[in-house]
Amino acid sequence: MAASRSSSRISFAKIIEPLEVPDLLALQTQSFDWLIGSDAWAERVQEAIDSGRDDVPITSGLEEVFKEISPIEDFSGSMSLSFRDHRFEPPKYSVEECKDKDMTFSAPLFVTAEFTNNNTGEIKSQTVFMGDFPLMTPKGTFVINGTERVVVSQLVRSPGVYFERSLDKASDKDLYSCKVIPSRGAWLEFEIDKRDTVGVRIDRKRRQSVTVLLKALGWDEARILERFGDFPSMRITLEKDHTAGQDDALLDIYRKLRPGEPPTRESAQTLLENLFFNPKRYDLAKVGRYKVNKKLSLGVAHDVGVLTENDIVRTIEYVVKLHAGADPAEYEVDDIDHFGNRRIRTVGELIQNQVRLGLARMERVVRERMTTQDVEAITPQTLINIRPVVASIKEFFGTSQLSQFMDQTNPLAGLTHKRRLNALGPGGLSRERAGFEVRDVHPSHYGRMCPIETPEGPNIGLIGSLSTFARVNPFGFIETPYRKVENGRVTGQIDWLTADEEDRHVKAQANTPLRPDGSFAEDRVLVRRKGGEVEFIPPDEVDYMDVSPRQMVSVATAMIPFLEHDDANRALMGSNMQRQSVPLLRSEAPLVGTGMEARAAKDAGDVVVCAQAGVVEDLSADYITVMHDDGTRRTYRLAKFRRSNQGTCINQKPIVNEGDRVGAGQVIADGPCTDNGEMALGKNLLVAFMPWEGHNYEDAIILSQRLVQDDVLSSIHIEEHEVDARDTKLGPEEITRDIPNVAEEVLADLDERGIIRIGAEVSPGDVLVGKVTPKGETELTPEERLLRAIFGEKAREVRDTSLKVPHGESGKVIGVRVFSREDGDELPPGVNELVRVYVAQKRKITDGDKLAGRHGNKGVIAKILPAEDMPFLEDGTPVDVVLNPHGVPRRMNIGQILETHLGWVAKTGWQVDSGTEDWKERLRGIGADAASAGTNVATPVFDGAREEEITGLLDSTLPNRDGIQLIGSSGKAKLFDGRTGEPYPYPVAVGYIYILKLLHLVDDKIHARSTGPYSMITQQPLGGKAQFGGQRFGEMEVWALEAYGAAYALQELLTIKSDDVVGRVKVYEAIVKGENIPEPGIPESFKVLIKEMQSLCLNVEVLSSDGVQIEMRDTDEDVFRAAEELGIDLSRREPSSVEEV
C-alpha cells in the first residue's frame, strides 16, 4: 500500500509516484514573478544557471519591454531617450485594505530614464514614476477596485511556419500551402494551385507568382533555376512570370499591396523591407524563431525576430518538395491542433503585451515632444507622459476578456479558475468560427490539458484546464513529466517533454507492472506512439514511462473517486459541479477520497499554512500566533465571515491548540470547504437506491427531515447592499433617520445616523439605510424669497430614497461600512457618502435545491420526508437520501455505486481476519487489515480500489452494536418502510455517498410579482427576477387559451395585466376599494400597430360595435386624465403611481 500524504487516509493505490504534484499555482505565480523580475524569479534563474538548465528565461518581462523600446530617437536622430533598471516600491496598502476600500492592490513602478543629446554627447538621467502597477497576491489573483480577479492563460496558435494539405475536389489533387505567422507583423503565405504554379500572398493581399518575390529579393532567373530547377512546379511558375528583373518585381509587389498609389523603386524597396526585415514592424518572437528553425532545420540565432532571405527560400523549397512527393519522414504537413503548435500566453506575457502597447503609444508622444521642446530645457521628465501606459494596463485588467471576476464559490472553483486555459479572447478563436476539430480531444493533450474538464455549452473544448503535473516552459509550450527508461529498466531520471518532443518517443503507462529493480515484469509492454497509436512491444524498445496515472487529468477531475468506472460525459459534469458546491456550516471531508484533497486545499490558498516550524503561542477565533524555532514570532490573521465574489461565506477557524508543535508548511487553520486541511465540498450521507412512490422519478431526490433540523446541509450566504449620497441639481442627498411619512417602528433598528444596527434581523422591504433626496421646487417669487430670508428656511420638500431589503431577501446584518468624503475616503465624483450593509442569511436545505454527487449524478429535491417515514435499516437507522436506481445504468456512471459500497465499508470499519482464507488472499494488496469506524480512505483515479477488494471488505465490515452485519458482500441491505414498518420485498443497495449542495438554490430563483415596473417603450411589465418582472404569456400560451375558448381570461391577460395603461390604474383602484373590475380599455400595443400602419400611409379608423369611430389618444393624455379623476399625484414615486403600478 502506498503511503498517503494525509496520515488519516488509507490508500488503495498500488503505484508509488516518483514525483510530487508540482505547485498548482505555479502557472500564475511564476509567470508574474518573471514579468516584474521578483526575487523568487532571480533565485530560479540562479538555480537554473548553476545546474546548467535553460528552462528559466534570464531576462525579466518588463526589462525586455524597456530594452525593446530603447532608445527612442527623434526624427533627425539628434536626440534619444532610453530606459533601464526598473524597480518597485512597497505597496501603499495591504491586500485586505484594498478589498475593504475598493482600491487596486498595486505598487509604484520607477524606471531610470536617460536623455542623450547625440550632437553634444550630454546625458541627463532621472528616475521616472511610471504609474501604479497591479501586483499579484500570494494566491495568484489581482485585487482591482476592491474585487478579486483572475487573469486566465490563453491558448493560441504559436508563431512559426505551418504547412497544410488540402484536396482539390475538381482535379482530385493534393494541394499544398504554407503560412509564415509572426508574433506581430504581416503574414506570408505560399500556395500551389491545381495548375501546379507556386503563388505567394503578402499580408493577405492578392496572389502573385512566388518568383516575383524571389526576383524582388535580388534573385535572377538563372539563380532561381539553379536552386529550384528540379521542381516542375517552379519551372512552370517561372515560365508564366513576365516580370523583368528586381525593379519590375518590386513595383509589381507594390501595386498589389498599395493599389492606386504611384509606385517608385525606393518606396517599393522600403515597403518590402518594412514588412519582413524591420524589427520594429515584424517580430517572430523567440518562440516563432525556435519553431521556424526547428521546422526548416536552420541555425539562426534565437534573438533574430525578423525573417531572413534563407528563411523564405527554405520555406519555398519545403512546400515544393511536399508537392513533388518528398519522403514523408523528412517532409510532413503540420497538425494545427497539435500542442506542439499551440502555446500558452500566461499572465506575465499578457500583461507584458499590454505594457508594450502603452509604451508604443507613449513613444509617439515622446517623439512629438522632442521636436517641439527646447533642447536645453528637455529632461526625461518633460518628455515622458505615463498616461498611455497606465491607461493600457487599467484597460486590460478592467475590460479584457481574459481578466475575469474570480470564481470564489469554493476553494476548488478558485484553484481551477487560475489553472484555466482559454482559446477565446483577443488574438484567439471565436465561438462561432471554432469548428469541431479545434474543440476535440487530441492525443497531444495527454498530460497537458485535461480531456474531461471543459464547459458543457457553446464553449465546449475551447476552455480547458491544465493537467495535474503539467507545467509551461519559457516558450509557452506545455510540458509533462516522464520517467526515463534505459535498456528496459525505469531509471530515477525525470524528463519534462513538450508535445512535439514526446512524439519522437515511445511511452509506457504508469500502471505497467515493474519488478523491484525497475525492470518491466512482462515480456510485452503496452505503449503509446505518435498520434495516440497503441501497441505491445518488447521492454527494451520503451523510451519513457508516465509518472502517475492521474497525470492526464486536471485537479477537479482527479478528485473524483472511481473515475475509471464513469462515462466521460458524466465525469465532465462531476468535475464542473464540484466547482459549484457551496461551503456548508460544518465541512466534512469525504469518507471516500482520492488522495488529492489535501494538496488541492493547500494550494488553493484558502487555508492558513505555517511558514516556519515552531510552537503555537496564542490563538483565538481571529488570529494564531506562532513562536518560530529561530526566536521570531508571527501572527496569522484569520478571515471571519467575509463575503466571496459569489456571495458564499469565507470563514477560517484554527485547527491547532495552544502549545501545539507545528511544522513548516503545516495547515494550522481551515477555510471554507476544508476539513482538517483537506478539501471538503459536501457531506457523507446514507443513501438508498430505490424508487419511492414515484417521488424520485427523473432524478428527483428524496431527503430526510433530519438534514434540515440538524443543519447538515445548511450554508451561509452574505449579500452586500450599497447606497450612496450624491450631489443633485436640487441639492445634496442626505443619509438620515428623519424620513418623511415613515412610522417609528420601521426606524426602530436604525441608529442616529439612519444606518441599521449590526445584529438586526431584516426582511423584504425593511429600511437598511435612511436617505432623502431633494424634490424639485417651483421658482420662488421675490416676495417669497424675502419672507424666507427673514423667517428662516421652510422645511425642504424631500422624498424617501432609502435603501431597502430587496424582494425575497432577508437575514441578519453582520457588517456596516461607511465611507465619506469628509473622512478622506476616495469616492467617485459627485458622491459625498457611501454606505455598505452586509446581510447574512442561513439557508437550510429545502425542496427545489439542487444536489449532486461527484460522478455527474445530479438532481433536485422533490420531497423532504420526516425521518420516521424514511426507509430504515434492520437496526432502525433511517437513510438520509433516496435516489432512483434508474439514473445509473444508461448514464454509465457506475463510480457512484462503487463509492456507495466503499463508503459503507469506511463508515463501519473492517477487520479482514473475520473473512475467509479466500478473501484474505484477495485483500493482501490493501495493507491495512483492520480499520475503525469512520476511517477515511483514498482511491486514486486509475489506481483505486478494485471490485473484488470492495466485495471482500464488505464481507469483512465490523458488526453494529447489536452484533449484526447489516450489509454483506452483495452491498445490499434489508430495508423497512418507515411508514408501515413492513420490510421491502427486495434487498436495496445502501451506503455512504459524498453529496454536494450546489449554488443553484431555489431561494435565488423563485420569484413572484403582483404590481411592479413597466417598460417605458412598450408599457408592458419588465421581465426577469432582477427587474422584479412578470411572467411572459407568449404566443403559444395565447393559442392554448384560444383553444379552450377562455376569452375573458385572455382579454384580461392582453389588456389590464399587460399594457392597457389606463385600465390597470382603474383596476388597482377597484381592487383597493373592493369594487368590481371595470371593462378593459385599449392596449398600448394596439396603438403602436396603428401608428406603424399610419407610417405606411394607411389611414386606419377604429369603429365600435355600433359603427361609431373611436378616437385614439396618446397614452400621456389618458393617464393624466385617469390619474386626475382618481386623485393620484403623479409627481411622487410611490407604489400607487402609474410608473410603478
Swiss-Prot record:
The protein's enzyme class: transferase
GO biological process, one term: DNA-templated transcription
Upper taxonomic lineage: Bacteria, Bacillati, Actinomycetota, Actinomycetes, Frankiales
Subunit structure: The RNAP catalytic core consists of 2 alpha, 1 beta, 1 beta' and 1 omega subunit. When a sigma factor is associated with the core the holoenzyme is formed, which can initiate transcription.
Species whose genome carries this gene: Frankia casuarinae (strain DSM 45818 / CECT 9043 / HFP020203 / CcI3)
Record-given protein name: DNA-directed RNA polymerase subunit beta
Function of the molecule: DNA-dependent RNA polymerase catalyzes the transcription of DNA into RNA using the four ribonucleoside triphosphates as substrates.
GO cellular component, one term: DNA-directed RNA polymerase complex
Catalytic activity: RNA(n) + a ribonucleoside 5'-triphosphate = RNA(n+1) + diphosphate
PROSITE patterns in UniProt: RNA_POL_BETA
Top-rank taxon, per record: Bacteria
Classification via NCBIfam families: PRK00405.1 (NF001616), rpoB (TIGR02013)
Enzyme Commission code: 2.7.7.6
Family: Belongs to the RNA polymerase beta chain family.
Leader sequence residues: none
GO terms, molecular function: DNA binding; DNA-directed RNA polymerase activity; ribonucleoside binding
Keyword annotations from UniProtKB, A to Z: DNA-directed RNA polymerase, Nucleotidyltransferase, Transcription, Transferase
Keyword Transferase (UniProt): yes
Keyword GTP-binding included in the entry's annotation: no
